[in-house]
A protein has these predicted regions:
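A short, basic/flexible loop-to-alpha-helix module at the beginning of a structural domain
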Residues: 1-8
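Alpha-helix N-cap/helix-initiation motif
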Residues: 2, 16-17, 40
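Extracellular/periplasmic catalytic domains that process cell-envelope and extracellular macromolecules
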Residues: 5, 30, 40
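Generic signal for short, ordered secondary-structure residues
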Residues: 6, 26, 84-85
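N-terminal Rossmann-like FAD-binding beta1-loop-alpha1 element of flavoenzymes
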Residues: 11-36
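Conserved N-terminal/central alpha/beta ligand/cofactor-binding core
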Residues: 39-166
Length: 166
């Protein structure tokens, strides 16, 4: 199979889940010509089937809810649930510092808005730095009517995920 490629892109994003599409949005907004490729005939990756939830300490929605959290608590929690010597402290630091900025960017530059989950605890809320809620978020529902023809491109959601049509 010999197919010719006669396209020019600055960034090629592989996949169409939360992380991939956020990367594509940021690259596009930064002036790059972006191509998103997806092996499936449907969009959304595992983010679609899992409900699109994210775990970001100190996010804007938790701050707005006056949640008790801190960067140090997030560090302590991640350390408490990670095998000793098996994590890269620089990557963890980047995650907890930049995660809230990512949520801010999406909130300010896209239609993606999240709902704070004040009663959705960390997996181990009693561990050092653990919290009883406000770190996990899920996307606000999007009307299927707004998606029009693009609705049929979305990966099937988990059976327990709510989808509103109007």
């Amino acid at each position: 199979m010999n197919k010719e490629w006669d396209f020019d892109y600055d960034v090629i994003v592989v996949g169409s889940g939360n992380g991939a599409l956020t990367s594509a949005l940021c690259a596009h907004d930064g002036g790059a010509k972006v191509l998103v490729i997806e092996k499936s005939s449907q969009l959304g990756g595992t983010s679609a089937s899992s409900g699109g939830g994210v775990w970001i300490p100190n996010n804007r929605y938790a701050v707005a809810a006056n949640a008790d959290d801190s960067i140090q608590d997030a560090r302590d929690y991640i350390a408490s649930v990670s095998p000793e010597g098996k994590i890269n402290p620089e990557l963890i630091e980047t995650y907890i510092q930049e995660g809230p900025k990512m949520i801010d960017y999406l909130h300010e530059n896209s239609r993606v808005k999240y709902l704070n989950l004040p009663h959705y605890p960390d997996y181990f809320p009693d561990n050092p730095g653990g919290k009883a809620g406000n770190r996990s978020m899920e996307p606000e529902p999007v009307s299927g009517t707004d998606l029009k023809e693009d609705l049929k491109l979305l990966r099937d959601q988990h059976p327990q995920t709510t989808f509103r049509m109007g």
